Amino acid sequence: MKRKVQVKNITIGEGRPKICVPIIGKNKKDIIKEAKELKDACLDIIEWRVDFFENVENIKEVKEVLYELRSYIHDIPLLFTFRSVVEGGEKLISRDYYTTLNKEISNTGLVDLIDVELFMGDEVIDEVVNFAHKKEVKVIISNHDFNKTPKKEEIVSRLCRMQELGADLPKIAVMPQNEKDVLVLLEATNEMFKIYADRPIITMSMSGMGVISRLCGEIFGSALTFGAAKSVSAPGQISFKELNSVLNLLHKSIN
């Protein structure tokens, strides 16, 4: 039986896929403005994409913004993510700082989840995951391929590896070159969900071509999807309001 992931009042892996909406402001003013706009919205999780923040290399300033951000969103679960340039992010930082940043933020008690990239390496992952779990912070271990869609077996292998490394939520996002690539991602998702996963997983095929994968998680086995507030943080994201309507429609039809 698959275990569910409880984050505040949200149960990931139960019912329809949960909606996560990123905050991508470059400065404190913009970040707080986005937070105010989202605090009463129909969403499940807010992601702070801290790699967009102009002063991300100053941990003190990151914490100050985080404290204010939390005060506005109240009890909405918060995911903290620094996305590396290699995987589609905005800034380049050292692995040492990446590790320190995630540990320092996990220690604040202000975030509910953090995202750690699979290809940061086992040493970084072990250190961050173990620390976060001691602080009762859930961990997404993720991989983003902006160039291609790997073979089905490779997608499943990466998700299994994330699970082995202690991810509460394994996540993979891939780029389709054609319609068949979208089917490969969906087939890999379903195989992982039905055969190998003992916890919720998150998958998506990016770009407009892959948008169907962001909508049909309840059918194929992806437990969380990302929607945009105004600006997108990844190719293929659609408005979280439209996403909410479609997910509700599918959930009603399925059940």
UniProtKB/Swiss-Prot annotation:
3-dehydroquinate binds at residues 47-49, 83, 214, 233, 237. The keyword Lipoprotein does not apply. The keyword Lyase applies. It catalyses: 3-dehydroquinate = 3-dehydroshikimate + H2O. Disulfide bonds: none annotated. It comes from the Bacteria. Its EC number is 4.2.1.10. The active site is at residues 144, 171. GO terms for molecular function: 3-dehydroquinate dehydratase activity. InterPro entries: 3-dehydroquinate_DH_AS, Aldolase_TIM, DHquinase_I, Type-I_3-dehydroquinase. Pathway: Metabolic intermediate biosynthesis; chorismate biosynthesis; chorismate from D-erythrose 4-phosphate and phosphoenolpyruvate: step 3/7. GO terms for biological process: 3,4-dihydroxybenzoate biosynthetic process; amino acid biosynthetic process; aromatic amino acid family biosynthetic process; chorismate biosynthetic process. Keywords: Amino-acid biosynthesis, Aromatic amino acid biosynthesis, Lyase, Schiff base. Belongs to the type-I 3-dehydroquinase family. Homodimer or homotetramer. Involved in the third step of the chorismate pathway, which leads to the biosynthesis of aromatic amino acids. Catalyzes the cis-dehydration of 3-dehydroquinate (DHQ) and introduces the first double bond of the aromatic ring to yield 3-dehydroshikimate. This is 3-dehydroquinate dehydratase. It comes from Clostridioides difficile (strain 630). The gene is aroD.
